[in-house]
Amino acid sequence: MMEMITIKPGKITVQANPNMPKEVAELFRKQHYEIVGRHSGVKLCHWLKKSLTEGRFCYKQKFYGIHSHRCLQMTPVLAWCTHNCIFCWRPMENFLGTELPQPWDDPAFIVEESIKAQRKLLIGYKGNPKVDKKKFEEAWNPTHAAISLSGEPMLYPYMGDLVEEFHKRGFTTFIVTNGTIPERLEEMIKEDKLPTQLYVSITAPDIETYNSVNIPMIPDGWERILRFLELMRDLPTRTVVRLTLVKGENMHSPEKYAKLILKARPMFVEAKAYMFVGYSRNRLTINNMPSHQDIREFAEALVKHLPGYHIEDEYEPSRVVLIMRDDVDPQGTGVEGRFIKH
């Protein structure tokens, strides 16, 4: 009999599900994911493909200098999450909630197998006449890991070690988390195993909106997020708060968002539109997708409540606006500059 994970204030007990059910794994494969080990996964990013075939790129390339064609998009927790967000493009109706896998795969195994999975997905581009040979060879050897693809990555108990394994291989790393596992961040701080850039996705300005938009699977999710934001403040790494904005749902109260952002005092804030894609189309309508102008106007309203921040850049194809802290060097790299240090 499987035991359920119990998530209590300040503690996570991991027991449970030995493997991903075959029907769930098959659903992901149909969506062009490669399953890695027991619980991880890889999928080629839309912008990686566009970079190879059309020379276009992701907003993270424009904002931070990440090379879209050399990005490995992966997750160590493919089908498990603490939220059921209405805007999620993943097949969360088939997610396994917080019933976590055990035993967990080794971090080094996940990294090596993720690189192999990426190459398996890339092989079809090798003979494509639209793809530059040198660019394909670079894509074959990724240098950046976006740990964010699906599920809540911080549920993986060895996240610090996973980051370290990527860094050993010369990768830069982004983690995108919903902020509900602050104890994982505490461990990573103690171990000094932080990612190159840490994102927290904040998609509600208050607990009422949180309950209706994020539909938490845990009883104290909001309190956990507040703790996570406090831990982010003054971290010795690059930090971002990302707002995924859904028209008619969470695109209100910029002053409340600002209070949350100032708890973390991140280097960057991204105001980004919800995109009407994937499984979210079963829950929302195209009218919930803000225009770039809507996002720009919301960012302008938000920054009025963020002393020490300004609008730095925007990228219309992704409907995203970059807000940056005033003390970040717009030409610099690393923990004091706008751009990633490769």
UniProtKB/Swiss-Prot annotation:
It catalyses: N(1)-methylguanosine(37) in tRNA(Phe) + pyruvate + S-adenosyl-L-methionine = 4-demethylwyosine(37) in tRNA(Phe) + 5'-deoxyadenosine + L-methionine + CO2 + H2O. Monomer. Belongs to the TYW1 family. The keyword tRNA processing applies. Signal peptide: none annotated. SUPFAM superfamilies: Radical SAM enzymes. It is found in: Cytoplasm. This is S-adenosyl-L-methionine-dependent tRNA 4-demethylwyosine synthase. Binds 1 [2Fe-2S] cluster. Binds 1 [4Fe-4S] cluster. The [4Fe-4S] cluster is coordinated with 3 cysteines and an exchangeable S-adenosyl-L-methionine. GO terms for cellular component: cytoplasm. GO terms for biological process: tRNA processing. The keyword Membrane does not apply. Pfam families: Radical_SAM, Wyosine_form. NCBIfam families: rSAM_TYW1. Keywords: 2Fe-2S, 4Fe-4S, Cytoplasm, Iron, Iron-sulfur, Lyase, Metal-binding, S-adenosyl-L-methionine, tRNA processing. Residues 64-312 form the Radical SAM core domain. GO terms for molecular function: 2 iron, 2 sulfur cluster binding; 4 iron, 4 sulfur cluster binding; metal ion binding; tRNA-4-demethylwyosine synthase activity. [2Fe-2S] cluster binds at residues 45, 58, 71. InterPro entries: Aldolase_TIM, rSAM, tRNA_wybutosine-synth, tRNA_wybutosine-synthase, TYW1_archaea. Its EC number is 4.1.3.44. It comes from Pyrococcus horikoshii (strain ATCC 700860 / DSM 12428 / JCM 9974 / NBRC 100139 / OT-3). Its cofactor is [2Fe-2S] cluster; [4Fe-4S] cluster. It comes from the Archaea.
